[in-house]
Amino acid sequence: QQCQVRIDSEDPYKKDGEIQVKGINVMIGYYKNEEATKAVFTEDGWMRTGDLGILDRQGNIYIHGRSKNMILGPSGQNIYPEEIEDKINSMPGVVESIVVDRDHKLVALIFPENPGDNNVVAMMEAHRVALNKQLPQYSQIASVEVVPQEFEKTPKKSIKRFLYS
């Protein structure tokens, strides 16, 4: 076998867990960094990817987010901001968004197509109301903030979330 995958979950078919991999194609560790290597590998040699997901019966993996991005809801629910962001980003007039936890409330930061438009705040608020009708109570957006410029990104074009928390 070239690569093995497992989900670290009590029920990987129904409950999200961390996706872990093992095989000849997986790195053996970080160069001259034993501490980082120990942190990323389990005791039995599986590499923690940091991705969270589930399996289906055919062996397909469904990624729901990153463990470091997960937000713990008010009653201990796992909230995956990427899933909410995908919905926001598909709405008219939205270029990109991130969902953050501020004082135990979910806030959507949205960069719109036309940040200078006088109606943009009202439009994004209407999007929030519509979106919340599709979401469980614990993952509903409490407020929206329109940001005037694109989010700062990594070289791989991922939003630098830590700048906006």
Where are these regions (language model features)?
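Generic structural signal for well-ordered beta-strand positions
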Residues: K15, D56, Y62, I79, ...
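Conserved AMP-binding/adenylate-forming
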Residues: Q1-I61, S67-M70, E85
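AMP-binding/adenylate-forming catalytic core of the ANL superfamily
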Residues: G23, I28-G29, L52-Q137
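Conserved C-terminal "lid"/linker of ANL adenylate-forming enzymes
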Residues: H104, V129-S165
